[in-house]
Amino acid sequence: MIGLLKVVACQALSQISVDKNRIQVYKENPQYWQHKSEPVLLLGGSVEDNLFQIPNLKEHLDLLQSVGGNYVRCTMSCRDEGNVWQFNEVEGLYNLDQWNEEFWQRFNNFLRLTAERDIIVQIEVWATFDYYRLNWDINPFNPKNNVNYTFAQTNLPEVVDSHPTQTENNFFWSVPAENNQRIVLKYQEKFVDQILFYSLKFDHVLYCMDNETSVTPEWGKFWAEYIQAKANDAEVNVETTEMWDSHNLFHTQHQNTLGHPELYSFCDASQNNHQRGQKHWDNAQKFRAQLNPVRPINSVKIYGSDQYHFGDDQDGFERFWRNVFGGMASARFHRPPSGLGLGPLACRHLKSMRMLTDNIHIFSCQPNNHLLSNRRENQAYAITNIGKEVAVYFPKSGTIDIDLSLFDADLTLQWLNINQSEWLNQMSVHGGKVVALTTPSQGHWAVLIR
C-alpha cells in the first residue's frame, strides 16, 4: 500500500505546473538557483541560525540586504535563551496538541520579512542538537515534559548524555521503515504540518531535513517524501535536501544525497567547510563531478573564526570565496563563534563578492584552474566563461600566470580590493597569450578580466 501511495504521489508531482516565481533549480545551468524567473547566487551570514527567534530581526535583515546578502538559515530550534518552544505549556508541562502562538507568530513574521526583501530561506526542519544532552532534558517531546505520552508508550529516553553522532535518541527512529513508533510520529507530523502551513504560502523557501545528522537515511527519506507530498497537495513544488554530519564528502552518508535526486533536488556541502586550503577546494570539485544529474550545492554554514576552533578568520574568508569560485549555489557565514556571522569583516566580504558577481555572469561560468600556471597550492582560483570573461581570487598576495589564448586580443582588467570593497581603475590587457597577474598589495584580492 505504501509503495502504491509513493507511485501515485510521484505521478501527481510530475503533473504540477511549477510556479516560475518559486525558488527552483535554474533551467539554463542547474548548478544554480532561480527565483522570480531570474538566476540568483545566494550569499549570506547571520548572528544566529534560528533568526525567527531573535528580537531585532528586521534590522538584521536590513543589514544583510545592505551588503548584498540574500540568504539565511532557519533551524526550527528553540534551545537558546530568549527562544520559545512550539507547544503550549501549562503548569510546567507541554501539551503537544496545543500550539504556542508566539512561536508561530515569530516564524510567520520571519517568512514575511524575508519575502519582502527577496532573501531566500533554507529551513532545517529538525534541529538535531535540540534533541540531545541538556536540550533534550527541557524539550517538549521528552515524555517527562508533556501530557501526551509516556516513556513506556514510546520507548523514548529520559536522558541522552551522548553527542548526536552516537544516535542514541529513538526520537529519530520513529519512521515506518525503522521503529514505526506511531505515537511519536503523530506529533512529529503535526509539527511538520504546521511548519508547512506557513511556509508553503511563500515562494522563497528551501527545505533541509536536518542539521548534521548521523541517523538512518530512512529518517530523511521519510520527511523528504512527506514534505514533497504535502507540497503536492498544495499544488506547489518544493526543493529538498539533507545535511549529513560527516566532514568527508565521500563518506557513505553523503552518498544518500548524491544517489537519490528524486528525494534530494539539491545538496548541502556545509561540512566540507571543516576542510582547509587546497583540500577544501579539491574535495568540493570532486563532489561536484559526481553529481548526476547536476544539482545546486549549497553551503549554508561556513566555519572559521578567530573566536573558535573550526579554523580562523582567514579560513572563513577563504572558504567563502572558494565556495563561490568553485561553483557552489550558495555561501553563508556560520553564526558566531563558529563563524563570522554578519559581523563587520563578514559584511566586507559579502559586499565585495556581490560587487564582483554583479559584474560577471556567474551563471554562465565554471571553475577552471587549468587556466592558471606557476601556481602554488591554495594560491589562486579561477572561474570563467571561456573566451568572454574570467575572475581570479587570491587568498593572499602573490603572482600567477593566466592563459588568455582563447580570449580576444583587447581586454580590460580590474582589481577588486576585497578587504575594502573597492574597485581599482580599469586597465587594458592583451589577450591571446599567457599574462602574469600580480596582486596590487597584501590581503585578499580578486581580478576581473573581460
Regions found by a protein language model. Name each.
Residues 20-263:
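Active-site mouth of glycoside hydrolases
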Residues 182, 187-190, 201-348:
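Extracellular glycoside hydrolase catalytic/binding regions
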Residues 304-307, 312, 316-427, 438-450:
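Aromatic- and carboxylate-lined catalytic core of secreted/periplasmic carbohydrate-active enzymes
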Residues 7-9:
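N-terminal signal peptide c-region/cleavage motif recognized by signal peptidases
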Residues 433-435:
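Short strand-edge motifs at loop-to-beta-strand transitions and within beta-strands
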